[in-house]
């Protein structure tokens, strides 16, 4: 375990002068990412919303905070690529697994997994930080594919919502890297 240092010993270290390479975009810094301000959450299903944090069209990838204020459901879907999840608050899981995630839990979803995401009733809203590489393949009740959702669908959905609530699509475009 690292030693506990009680002073900010690094205060005299000078920052790097040229932080970004000429073709690099700046970092995406978002204060209070799991905010309570519901305008930032894009309805994903009737019971679950997504707060976009970072979007990469060239990689078909996005990061978001998925939120449900009560019992919630994300339609059955399949991931051809890995997904990472860190639980901020609340309680959630997949009908197909016997674990239930709560605050502080981490989940790595392997490529090739199909599941049904549910948010359980809990005093705190379900908020989960996800790193998703698309597409999501929508599944019917028997597990057969019946549609897809990729980063371009995500961008269109987010832009439309941000325009509707007065935040503007420029706020979404600023997240593109």
Label the predicted regions.
Residues 60-69, 74-76:
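Small beta-barrel nucleic-acid-binding modules, principally OB-folds
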Residues 85, 107-109, 123-141:
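A short hydrophobic beta-strand segment most commonly corresponding to one strand
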Residues 109-110, 153-155:
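C-terminal and inter-domain tail/linker signature
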Residues 57-59, 93-119:
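Short acidic-glycine-tyrosine-enriched beta hairpin
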């Amino acid at each position: 375990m690292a030693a506990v240092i009680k002073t900010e010993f690094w205060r005299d270290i000078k920052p790097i002068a040229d932080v970004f390479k000429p073709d690099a975009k700046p970092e995406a810094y978002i204060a209070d990412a799991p905010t309570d301000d519901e305008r930032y959450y894009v309805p994903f299903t009737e019971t679950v919303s997504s707060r976009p944090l970072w979007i990469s069209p060239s990689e078909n990838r996005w990061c978001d905070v998925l939120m449900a204020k009560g019992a919630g459901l994300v339609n059955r879907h399949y991931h051809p690529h890995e997904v990472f999840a860190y639980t901020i608050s609340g309680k959630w899981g997949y009908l197909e697994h016997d674990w239930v995630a709560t605050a502080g839990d981490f989940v790595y979803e392997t490529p090739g997994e199909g599941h049904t995401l549910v948010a359980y009733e809990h005093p705190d809203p379900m908020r989960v930080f996800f790193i998703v590489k698309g597409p999501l393949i929508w599944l019917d009740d028997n597990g057969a594919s019946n549609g897809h959702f990729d980063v371009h669908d995500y961008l269109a959905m987010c832009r439309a919502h941000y325009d509707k609530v007065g935040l503007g699509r420029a706020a979404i475009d600023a997240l593109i890297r």
